[in-house]
Design a protein with these regions (language model features):
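Feature captures the catalytic ectodomains and active-site-proximal regions of enzymes
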Residues: 1-390
Length: 390
């Protein structure tokens, strides 16, 4: 039977959605603006799959005979973050935005967190991760206080130096925060942000990040696959995004290339169902930090691995590559951007060069995955399996 290898290239948006101005994101285009800033970008394998042939892509020449199926998806859910994007992909729409705390967290929340963890809080405001470490990192090392901060996303983030607060204690504090941030105060994610380094300006966040999500509101495609007795193998932060729900096996990764390595390892193993990978570096290392050149280089690095991924596929396997939101490194601020996501599909036994056009929802991807694996379809989404079958 077919397996699906589903790779999320985190934040690689492909142009502003019609409602992007409502989200403060006029004229954004993550991939397009990177290409405009670096016209020498080399992503030949994504181009072979058809990324330059997608409707509305005017920043890259289309090619004559793409080997993949290609299109783009609009987002129905009211958000532009990781949780919202991944949940919609798997058939759960977020129609009421997750709560955000643009002025920091209320005193009663911080008081309860301090009481239950036994640690004082500093920060408690919206900030980028690098800025907050420059501001409070040395204080945190001297005092043992913890840095709590948020962003335009629905997140409660806790930063601590790995030499001062052990990872297990940091993770335990995140579990406490997750319990507190429920009900009327529910945030989409509590995030552990460990860092290392000697002083401000030299602090580096480590790959020991962990996300503590809410459970999806409804069953996802992952639940349907698991309940059918198939594998749902989560690579990278997929397990965290779904709070483990619908997952049969998981491995966390330290960077994009480790994520690709583990994906290829699983493709080569005996398993049935879904291998679901998130490659987060595009977003966390380059999008939020508005590092255009780093983002370009990360795209090129991933592109060089696509032939290895394709070579590892079995005859009936289907590869899907898409993003979950945008994070335009040329845009103001440090937050995600509301964009269409590219959709690339490849398989040795599916059609080539099919234009899927503009899909109405990210959920069409999950519906197609369910359809390919012959499991129950999700509540939302329209499968395009019939468009790609030979």
């Amino acid at each position: 039977m077919s397996r699906v290898v589903w790779i999320v290239i985190d934040s690689v948006g492909i142009g502003a959605l019609p409602d992007s101005e409502k989200f403060g994101d006029k004229g954004v285009n993550t991939l397009g603006n990177i290409v405009k800033a670096h016209s020498d970008i080399k992503i030949p394998n994504m181009r072979k799959l058809g990324i330059g042939n997608i409707d509305g892509v005017d920043f890259m020449q289309p090619i004559e005979n793409p080997i993949g199926v290609y299109g783009k998806c609009a987002e129905v859910s009211q958000g532009k973050d990781t949780t919202t994007g991944h949940w919609e992909m798997t058939g759960v729409l977020v129609e009421t935005p997750f709560k955000t705390f643009e002025n920091g967290f209320p005193k009663d929340i911080i008081d309860e967190f301090e009481r239950r963890t036994g640690r004082k809080v500093v920060g408690n405001k919206p900030s980028s991760g690098t800025t907050i470490l420059d501001e409070y990192g040395e204080h945190q090392m001297k005092t043992g206080d913890v840095i709590v901060y948020t962003s335009a996303d629905s997140v409660f983030q806790i930063a601590a130096h790995e030499d001062i607060i052990p990872l297990e204690e940091l993770y335990s504090m995140c579990e406490i925060a997750r319990e507190i941030m429920m009900g009327d105060n529910a945030v989409a994610r509590v995030i552990a942000r460990p860092y290392v380094g000697p002083k401000a300006g030299e602090f580096v966040r480590t790959s020991n990040r962990r996300d503590y999500s809410l459970n999806p509101f409804e069953p996802t495609v992952l639940d349907n696959i698991k309940e059918s007795g198939l594998d749902v193998i989560a690579v990278g932060k997929i397990e965290d995004i779904f709070n483990g729900q619908g997952i049969t096996e998981a491995i966390h990764t330290k960077d994009n290339m480790h994520g690709v390595d583990e994906t290829i390892n699983y493709i080569k193993k005996e398993n049935n169902g879904l291998i679901f990978t998130n490659l987060v570096d595009f977003d966390s290392k380059y999008g939020h930090r508005r590092n255009i050149e780093g983002y370009k280089e990360a795209l090129e690095e991933f592109d060089t691995r696509i032939p290895q991924i394709i070579e590892a596929l079995n005859e009936d396997d289907i590869l899907i590559i898409n993003a979950d939101h945008g994070n335009d490194p040329t845009y103001k601020g440090t937050d995600h951007t509301r964009e269409y996501i590219p959709l690339l599909v490849y398989g040795k036994n599916i059609k080539q060069g099919v234009n899927l056009g503009i899909r109405k929802s990210f959920a069409d991807i999950g519906a197609t995955v369910a359809d390919i694996l012959n499991v129950k379809l999700p509540k939302h989404g329209e499968s395009f399996k019939n468009n790609i079958e030979k």
